[in-house]
């Protein structure tokens, strides 16, 4: 049994990598009835549509990204929430800026690997 009821992927803007990662996890780990899988952004001033390239990639894989970006807030954290980021800088930023932050890991750290994941935003399809 999973100890988390919420899994979040946190990126800068929540318009590309995070929502795509959440959609992939929901697709391959169909726990959406018991575990909330979503994404948030560190700098979301107002809801933005998804990056068109990301929507195209998702669509090609049979995934749907029909949402707008959401800002990370204190209420997103808790002992039942697992939060993933791409690199140590974002992880440290979360711990610096959110007093309720707990269970924040880089994806590689969570699987006991060193390093960060390079954000592919702006790259070729």
Report residues per predicted region.
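Conserved active-site segments centered on acidic
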Residues: 1-79
């Amino acid at each position: 049994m999973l100890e988390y009821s919420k899994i979040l992927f946190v990126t800068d803007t929540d318009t590309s990598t995070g929502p795509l990662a959440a959609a992939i996890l929901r697709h391959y780990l169909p726990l959406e009835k018991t575990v909330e899988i979503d994404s948030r952004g560190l700098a979301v001033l107002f809801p933005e549509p998804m990056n068109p390239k990301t929507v195209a990639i998702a669509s090609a894989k049979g995934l749907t990204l029909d949402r707008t970006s959401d800002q990370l807030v204190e209420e997103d954290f808790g002992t039942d929430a697992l939060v993933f980021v791409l690199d140590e800088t974002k992880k440290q930023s979360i711990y610096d800026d959110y007093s309720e932050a707990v269970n924040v890991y880089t994806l590689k750290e969570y699987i006991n690997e060193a390093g960060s994941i390079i954000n592919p935003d702006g790259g070729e399809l």
